[in-house]
Swiss-Prot record:
It comes from Yarrowia lipolytica (strain CLIB 122 / E 150) (Yeast). GO terms for cellular component: endoplasmic reticulum membrane. Residues 15-266 are lumenal. The keyword Endoplasmic reticulum applies. Coiled coil: none annotated. This is Protein BIG1. GO terms for biological process: cell wall organization. It is a single-pass type I membrane protein. InterPro entries: Big1. Required for normal beta-1,6-glucan synthesis. Its main location: endoplasmic reticulum. It is found in: Endoplasmic reticulum membrane.
Length: 332
């Protein structure tokens, strides 16, 4: 009987929660740093979630409901590869293994939409290819995701968690902006079974330790690099937001030359262009050279004409002078 009582004391309803924001929220961190235990009440969990989401610094707010989630699920970190990557590349993270119950995520999503002037959009979890239609504008949006309850068997449970993490990645990558705030927990009334609490357990402890290293947060400050595109929040403009995602790169087309070497099409065009330019230059030069003798010939003709005119003038002058002298003699 005594052992049974001790077991009940150590076992209670417990709901884990993971929260993150792209931005370093100093006030939020000061608030959560006051927490001295890895267990909090459901009321406090709701307060922390609203404090994170109502900051309104993000373009996208993702509210994830995973019914039946337990703290021990995070012991297998390999089931959450994308979520872990998000936590590594965000400036603010908060995790709590044990909350005394879930929160009303639907109400949270509605309050964020109202507080931040965001639009709620639906996610089609039945479409495994494109659960969320891509959009290119920067209007703030709240994305509410409601996964199916987790199976009870260990292998099936891990498979479901991994599949949901993959679905979360597809949804997040469909958004145009890397400025994201996210919460993942269980909806009130859909919590997991009672679970023995470990006072030393932490969710993703390695990620949390890495963020305490000096300068670690500056590496990803204000951006997540989801598409390997460094984004600076201060310099990002509305036009640049449309180009956050890396444009597809195409391999250069090549042609096989006679010697068996591959030639890039762009290089080939440059070579052809250079040859054409050289040929045009030669044609222009030859045209100028061909025109030059004609100029000399014209110059020589003009000189002959001028010389003949001078002779004719001199001849006439002599005739006039001779006639004048003759008249003078006759008058004497």
């Amino acid at each position: 009987m005594k052992l049974a009582l001790l077991s009940l004391i150590g076992t209670a309803l417990a709901t884990p929660a993971v929260m993150l924001s792209h931005k370093e929220l100093t006030a939020f961190e000061k608030y959560t740093n006051k927490q001295t235990s890895n267990s909090i009440s459901a009321v406090e969990l709701d307060r922390v979630a609203r404090k994170l989401m109502h900051d309104c610094s993000a373009n996208t707010y993702v509210v994830v409901n995973q019914p039946g989630l337990k703290a021990k699920d995070f012991q297998t970190e390999s089931a959450f590869p994308f979520l872990k990557k998000l936590l590594e590349r965000t400036s603010t993270m908060y995790t709590v293994p044990y909350a005394d119950g879930g929160i009303e995520l639907g109400k949270l999503a509605n309050s964020v939409a109202k507080q931040c002037g965001a639009v709620k959009i639906d996610v089609n979890l039945d479409n495994n290819i494109t659960p969320l239609e891509e959009y290119m504008d920067t209007t703030k949006r709240v994305i509410e995701i409601n996964f199916e309850p987790l199976p009870n068997t260990y292998v099936s449970r891990l498979a479901a968690l991994a599949a949901n993490d993959e679905m979360l990645e597809k949804i997040v990558r469909a958004t145009p902006s890397p400025f994201i705030a996210l919460i993942l927990t269980s909806q009130k009334g859909e919590e997991g079974d009672f679970e023995t609490r470990n006072p030393d357990f932490k969710i993703f402890p390695g990620v949390a330790r890495a963020k305490t290293v000096p300068g670690a947060k500056d590496k990803y400050k204000y951006h997540m690099e989801l598409q390997n595109v460094p984004v600076d929040e201060k310099k990002l403009t509305a036009e640049a937001l449309l180009k956050v995602k890396t444009p597809p790169t195409h391999a250069p087309e090549v042609r096989q030359t006679g010697d068996g070497e591959l030639v890039d099409d762009k290089l080939l065009l440059m070579i052809v262009g250079s040859v054409v330019a050289i040929l045009l230059s030669l044609l222009v030069f030859n045209g100028l050279m061909a025109a030059k003798p004609d100029v000399v010939k014209v110059d020589k003709t003009d000189a002959k004409v001028e010389k003949a005119v001078k002779k004719e003038v001199q001849k006439k002058e002599r005739l006039v002078n001779g006639r004048v002298e003759q008249l003078k003699r006759e008058t004497r």
